[in-house]
Amino acid sequence: MGVTPPPWTGPAVGLMDLDAFFASVEMLDHPEWRGKPLIVGGDADSRGVVSTCSYEARRFGVHSAMPSAEARRLCPQAIWTHGHFDRYHEVSAQVMAILADETPRVERVSIDEAFIDITPGRFAPEDPLLVARRISDRVAALGVTCSIGVGCNKTVAKIASERDKPFGLTIVRPGTEQRFLAALPVSAMSGIGRSAEERLRRMRIYTLGELSRAPESTLASIFGVNGEHMRQRALGLEISEVTSLDEEREVKSVSNERTFAKDLTERGDIEAAIALLGESVGRRLRRQGLTGATVTLKLKYSYGSGRTAQRRLPHPTDDENIFVAVALELLDNIWQEGMHVRLAGIGMSDFDHQGGIQTCLLYTSD
């Protein structure tokens, strides 16, 4: 008989992350694809990128945002399918309804990820472990799986959710946060990208435990005021509140722009830059469950001035193949041969919201 854990004290924050969500929905609708490498993101012969893939495909090295040609080389036997985003929104809405049934505090991060406040006695009637297990079982009954991490704050919950994927459940009970975090690499904590990780490595800081013990003055000299915040998070001491759906604000636009180290003068180079920026916007739209109806193209020139052009689409979309093609048509209106382009940007707005959307436009992993 298992040992009964002590009563949970303090906040209990969970992070529910649907496992390889787009691929899981495709396999739900096509049972014959289960157990086989599956790639969502168009055609193997296209010049696009992988949106997501099944865990079977990941064993061959395929991952999100990988060029389709490289994915085909790594896994030639994979099944390819275009995304069916209306269907993904439908299943996501069912999952979010389960979360809302368990707690009034649900903060949707993306179409396949949400924070939940399951603090016992405040927003949930039972120990967080029981609530998380019930959520996992209810989601699995829909035909997809999720991984859940629970801890005292968002940082701990997020890291915990990634420890045992897919279909995992990791609980970090109060008082055990530092022991759980100490041996993990600094890259396990969100907000530490490649640049920050490299700077920490130069300081011989490789783990969250080492980060938590670093002198405040040393971190401040490298990262400024963010250094102490990083150290507090590495100690598991972050204070973070889950914001309910009713309190979320709507995103007005999703855009991406780039300033070039050297001015672009050839139309082909400008088109390639716009296409690359558009792929990023498309991924962010899909992660946030947004479809936009207005395309905006922005250029700035070497002599300081700039121009923008907009066009409204007949139907909202999150497909970069559609809105990038429109942006390239708009290029004729604001660029002429001989112009030196210093900056290019592309954006989508006028959203058809698929449920409550959080304003934080973050990349997420499956």
Regions found by a protein language model. Give the residues of each.
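Non-catalytic surface loops within mature trypsin-like serine protease
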Residues: A20, P120, C152, Y301, ...
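Short Gly/Ser/Thr- and Asp/Glu-enriched loop/turn motifs at secondary-structure junctions
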Residues: V109-E113, G151-K154, L290-T294, M339-L343
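DNA-contacting surface of Y-family translesion DNA polymerases
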Residues: G2-P7, A188, A196, R201-V341, ...
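Residue-level detector of conserved catalytic or cofactor/ligand-binding positions
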Residues: C360-D366
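Gly/Gly-Pro- and Ser/Thr-rich, intrinsically disordered tail segments characteristic of DNA damage-repair
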Residues: M1-Q232, R283, S365
